[in-house]
Amino acid sequence: MLNQIKQDAQDRMTKSIDALRNSLASVRTGRASPSLLDGIKIKAYGTDTPLNQVASISVSEGRSLVITVFDKNMSKDVEKAIYASDLGLTPTVVGTLIRLNLPPLTEERRKELTKVVHSEGEDTKVAIRNIRRDANQQIKDMLKSKEITEDEVRQGEEDIQKLTDKAIKSVDEVVKSKEQELMTV
């Protein structure tokens, strides 16, 4: 039972870190990346469809993306979705090809994005600490119901703390990496 609590806590912490990575992938750096457009949805065939399901996205040169729409009739919808996104990009449409030129980030915008990245990192740390709190509470509940001894509680809490420290260190590394990527001109 104790191992199950630890495993559950570790799984939840890993999911939090993965969610942070996915979230930070949509933060625009100076370089073009297809993951930048992951959050864009197109009204297609009666539902909201992710852009990567109606078009292929590739990097052309260092600062531009080329979107090749599979269905020619979808080009206008894709263009509208890009305008509607908060990425601040202007698409150039030529038939089924859509070109996105990413302007270089200003120093001010880089600092704003660094703050956003730092804030997301802090939110993830809070989530990890909440997972630790939940796991420790489950361990204490087991003690109350006399399923485990005090020594096992202490050992379980130490193990959960080690998992937490490792997860928070991982969050710090992800945030630091993204901040360096942002500040690189």
From Swiss-Prot:
One of its GO terms (molecular function) is ribosomal large subunit binding. One of its GO terms (cellular component) is cytosol. CDD domains: RRF. Its main location: cytoplasm. Keywords: Cytoplasm, Protein biosynthesis. The keyword Nucleus does not apply. It is found in: Cytoplasm. GO terms for biological process: cytoplasmic translational termination. PANTHER family: MITOCHONDRIAL RIBOSOME RECYCLING FACTOR PSEUDO 1 (PTHR20982:SF3), RIBOSOME RECYCLING FACTOR (PTHR20982). Responsible for the release of ribosomes from messenger RNA at the termination of protein biosynthesis. May increase the efficiency of translation by recycling ribosomes from one round of translation to another. Belongs to the RRF family. This is Ribosome-recycling factor. It comes from Xylella fastidiosa (strain 9a5c). The lineage of its organism: Bacteria, Pseudomonadati, Pseudomonadota, Gammaproteobacteria, Lysobacterales. The gene is frr.
